[in-house]
Amino acid sequence: MTSVLFTSGATVTFRELIEVITSYDFIVETIIGNGITRMIVQYGNEIETGTQKHVSEEFYRQCVEDKELKQSLQLEVVSGSQNDSNVVTYRSNKYRGFEMVVFPFSNDIGSFISESDVVISHAGTGSIIDTLRLEKPLIVVTNDKLMNKHQEEVADELVKLGCCRKMTIEDMKSSQLKDCISEILSGPETFNKLPECSTTEVEGIIYHELVK
C-alpha cells in the first residue's frame, strides 16, 4: 500500500490546501494517478474562541459536501480508529483499493508520518521537524495568506539544504505536484539525509527565522 499524508497543522485552517485536496480531479489525477492507495488528511483543529465552533472540521466538511466528493468517489465509512475516535477511514467503491483516512488532529501524528511514503505539509515548524526526524520525503506547501513570511523563509532554507521540496498552492493545482510525487515514488532518493547534528541545525534555522 502506497500512502501520502497531507497535514495542514493544528492552529490555523489552511483553507487553500483543503480546497485543492478535496477536489475529485486532484484526487483522481494526482493521487490515484500516481498509484497511491491510501490518502491521509489531517485537516486542522482550529477552534473559534467563545463559540467553540470547530472551524477546521466545518470547513473540511463543507468542501467535501460542495464538491460531492463522497458521491463522486463512492466513499463509504469503513470504521473509526480503534485508538482515536476522531480518525475516520473511508473506502472507495469506484476505485477499488483506494481509501481516505481523515482527522482534525492527532497526538500521535508521528505514526501517520511513519506509515506514509510522501508527506505534503503546511510550512509549520512542528510538522516539518516531525517529518525530518522520521526521514520521510517532504513537500512543503507555503501559505501566502499569512502576513508573517517566516514559514516561507524556513522552507527556502530547508530546500537549500536539500531536505525537502517547496510548492505553492498554484503549483499544486498544476501538474507540478503530480510530477514531483511521481519522481519521489519511482526514482532514487531525492532528498539529502541530515547528518547527526542536523536536527539541531534545522531547529537553529527555524529559531533564527522566528526571532528575526
Curated annotation (Swiss-Prot):
InterPro entries reported in the protein's UniProt record: Alg13-like (IPR039042), Glyco_trans_28_C (IPR007235)
GO cellular component: endoplasmic reticulum
Annotated catalysed reactions: an N-acetyl-alpha-D-glucosaminyl-diphospho-di-trans,poly-cis-dolichol + UDP-N-acetyl-alpha-D-glucosamine = an N,N'-diacetylchitobiosyl-diphospho-di-trans,poly-cis-dolichol + UDP + H(+)
A Pfam family of this chain: Glyco_tran_28_C
Location of this chain's protein in the cell: Endoplasmic reticulum
Stretches that traverse the bilayer: none
SUPFAM superfamilies per UniProt: UDP-Glycosyltransferase/glycogen phosphorylase
Keywords, alphabetical: Endoplasmic reticulum, Glycosyltransferase, Transferase
Disulfide bonds: none
Enzyme class: transferase
Entry's family note: Belongs to the glycosyltransferase 28 family.
PANTHER family linked: GLYCOSYL TRANSFERASE-RELATED, N-ACETYLGLUCOSAMINYLDIPHOSPHODOLICHOL N-ACETYLGLUCOSAMINYLTRANSFERASE
Its job: Involved in protein N-glycosylation. Essential for the second step of the dolichol-linked oligosaccharide pathway.
Official protein name in the record: UDP-N-acetylglucosamine transferase subunit ALG13
Organism, as annotated: Debaryomyces hansenii (strain ATCC 36239 / CBS 767 / BCRC 21394 / JCM 1990 / NBRC 0083 / IGC 2968) (Yeast)
Gene name of this polypeptide: ALG13
